[in-house]
Amino acid sequence: MAGHSQFANIKHRKGAQDAKRAQKFTKLIREIIVAAKQGLPDPEFNSRLRSAIIAAKKENLPKDRIDAAIKSATGNTQTDNYEEVVYEGYGPGNIALMIQTLTNNRNRTAAELRHALSKYNGKLGESGSVSFLFNHVGVIAYKASSIDSFDSLFNTAIELHALDVEEIIQDDTQEKIYYVICNVQDFGNVRDQLFHKFSDAEFSRLFWKASDTVKIEDEEIQKKISNLMDLLENNDDVQYIDSNFTFY
């Protein structure tokens, strides 16, 4: 399925290009640690860890720090004991937000997110208050230039029981990207099988895909949303932010 969609602005590794390198590294290292803890600390046998390492290398995270993160995952330190927590909230213009975090202190993270949202007339919601507006899916993305043809990827994805493949032009780079969308329970297998046939994906992750999008045309509200997103993205615990708004 070709065209413009909410995937056009997806941030594979959260944060704008001008984000501080140290902050990017912090988020990448956390993902490596969590991925290594969830399976074998070997990317050959752990697809999530492999994806995390690929993302880290693209951001030029030094190899010694990647290795150190994997090694720390086998330890038992409280500071490296991160858990994945998804927070739900509303922002300016009543937009819905699904905020995915890796945190070692739920109370701290919740307090910081609540403060950020309230600053821009938003609020942190209870579990289930926003998620019903989204479908939880897996996304595996490939640059069109890295694939022989769309049909080849599409046919393979459908054979693996993927839900769809979207062909999107990225707004910032004008580069064509193919997004394979699958059920959460199939995500690991689809990612692994695509890797074996097409090699490394540009990125892959679980994504909250809005059932419907809300178009925000008011410039003042657009500005508030942009400022809120920047503030949330500057939080070290926040990995990804999925939403249901568009400015287009």
Curated annotation (Swiss-Prot):
Principal place of residence: cytoplasm
| Any single Pfam family the record assigns to this protein | Transcrip_reg
Cellular component, GO annotation: cytoplasm
Any single biological process term in GO: regulation of DNA-templated transcription
Q: What keywords does the record list, in alphabetical order?
A: Cytoplasm, DNA-binding, Transcription, Transcription regulation
Q: InterPro entries attached here?
A: Integrase-like_N, TACO1_YebC-like_2nd/3rd_dom, TACO1_YebC_N, Transcrip_reg_TACO1-like, Transcrip_reg_TACO1-like_dom3, YebC-like
Q: Where is this region: Disordered?
A: 1-21
Subcellular location field: Cytoplasm
Q: Give GO MF terms, alphabetically.
A: DNA binding
Superkingdom to which the source organism belongs: Bacteria
Q: Do the record's keywords include Zinc-finger?
A: no
Q: Does the keyword Cytoplasm apply?
A: yes
Entry-linked HAMAP family: Transcrip_reg_TACO1
Family named by the database record? Belongs to the TACO1 family.
This one is known as: Probable transcriptional regulatory protein ECH_0704
